[in-house]
Every structure is written in C-alpha cells, then in structure tokens.
Amino acid sequence: MRNEQRRGGQRRGKPNLLQRAGVVQVDWKDTDLLRRFISDRGKIRSRRVTGLTMQEQREVATAIKNAREMALLPYPAAAKR
C-alpha cells in the first residue's frame, strides 16, 4: 500500500538553499553562504544533502575550491589513524 502511494507522486527533496536565499550568482567571497555547503570537517556536502541542481552544485563546488585557495575556507581535515 505504501509503495502504491509513492508511484504517482513527485519526489520530495530537500529545499534548495540557494533559491530560498535568493542567490542568483554564487561568489567565492561569500563565505557565510558557502559554509552552509561544507561539513564540520570541511568536506563539500553532496547534492542529495543540499538539494541543489547539478549545475548549482558545480558552481558551489568551484566557489568553495576558490575560497579554499584564498584561505577563506578550510581544506578537509585529515583522518586520524
């Protein structure tokens, strides 16, 4: 019964953070926005978690990498062994 209800319905994903914030262009200098898309360890969160489209995820990832190069955001922490 549960599967029958899901078939015709739309996929419910996470709300898109960029659209909710009204962001049109992702900027590498906007660290407050970019920090929403990295974990506490500094890793870039996946599309499944953030709810972004493929193009938006690419833009966010590129902006995060540029901000890391400029020392505005941290690189991922190395795992302790």
Swiss-Prot record:
SUPFAM superfamilies: Ribosomal protein S18. Keywords: Ribonucleoprotein, Ribosomal protein, RNA-binding, rRNA-binding. GO terms for biological process: translation. One of its GO terms (molecular function) is structural constituent of ribosome. Pfam families: Ribosomal_S18. InterPro entries: Ribosomal_bS18, Ribosomal_bS18_sf. GO terms for cellular component: cytosolic small ribosomal subunit. Coiled coil: none annotated. Belongs to the bacterial ribosomal protein bS18 family. Part of the 30S ribosomal subunit. Forms a tight heterodimer with protein bS6. NCBIfam families: S18. Binds as a heterodimer with protein bS6 to the central domain of the 16S rRNA, where it helps stabilize the platform of the 30S subunit. HAMAP family: Ribosomal_bS18. This is Small ribosomal subunit protein bS18A. It comes from Saccharopolyspora erythraea (strain ATCC 11635 / DSM 40517 / JCM 4748 / NBRC 13426 / NCIMB 8594 / NRRL 2338).
